[in-house]
């Protein structure tokens, strides 16, 4: 039998039920079987699906505001810990070991069963590398539900207080006075910033500039 077309693979994905897995109850609405490799656009769509499932899961728990606050704290924890980011993004670490290590961190930091079940489901689906993107997508969804605008800001290093103040001033100057900033550390950017506000993208990263230089050099060759 030949390979199954991608659209049929998507249609055949099962959705998590309320049954338990190794890490606790699965989060309703999250695909339990997924293709291993996805494009950047697909990753964005995947993050939104997980974020939507988490929002529904949190709402059903009766502690939506508490879950929102703790997921925000988890995002900050990832941004502040190079070791944790390395663990999440490493293809060399066994999936089960990575899951257990991350869940141990959540236990030590006082996260609840809700966050533990969610992260466990993400890990079991081999999506720990997308966890920070999922958290950012969750923040955007929360802002939309509240009628707020949100700027997702990716930087190679955690922004200092001065840099964040300068960024907010630049956003105000650009007409985004009442916007919430969702920060995300991505060392692969090398330097500069990537700012997403709705469908608008502002990319001043060193990585992007180097890529443009490479394209220009290839075109001149």
Curated annotation (Swiss-Prot):
One of its GO terms (molecular function) is proton-transporting ATP synthase activity, rotational mechanism. PROSITE patterns: ATPASE_DELTA (PS00389). Residues 1-13 have a biased composition (Basic and acidic residues). It is found in: Cell inner membrane. Residues 1-31 are annotated as: Disordered. It comes from the Bacteria. Keywords: ATP synthesis, Cell inner membrane, Cell membrane, CF(1), Hydrogen ion transport, Ion transport, Membrane, Transport. InterPro entries: ATP_synth_OSCP/delta_N_sf, ATPase_OSCP/d_CS, ATPase_OSCP/dsu. GO terms for cellular component: plasma membrane; proton-transporting ATP synthase complex. It is a peripheral membrane protein. Pfam families: OSCP. NCBIfam families: ATP_synt_delta, PRK05758.3-2. Belongs to the ATPase delta chain family. F-type ATPases have 2 components, F(1) - the catalytic core - and F(0) - the membrane proton channel. F(1) has five subunits: alpha(3), beta(3), gamma(1), delta(1), epsilon(1). F(0) has three main subunits: a(1), b(2) and c(10-14). The alpha and beta chains form an alternating ring which encloses part of the gamma chain. F(1) is attached to F(0) by a central stalk formed by the gamma and epsilon chains, while a peripheral stalk is formed by the delta and b chains. F(1)F(0) ATP synthase produces ATP from ADP in the presence of a proton or sodium gradient. F-type ATPases consist of two structural domains, F(1) containing the extramembraneous catalytic core and F(0) containing the membrane proton channel, linked together by a central stalk and a peripheral stalk. During catalysis, ATP synthesis in the catalytic domain of F(1) is coupled via a rotary mechanism of the central stalk subunits to proton translocation. This is ATP synthase subunit delta. It comes from Granulibacter bethesdensis (strain ATCC BAA-1260 / CGDNIH1).
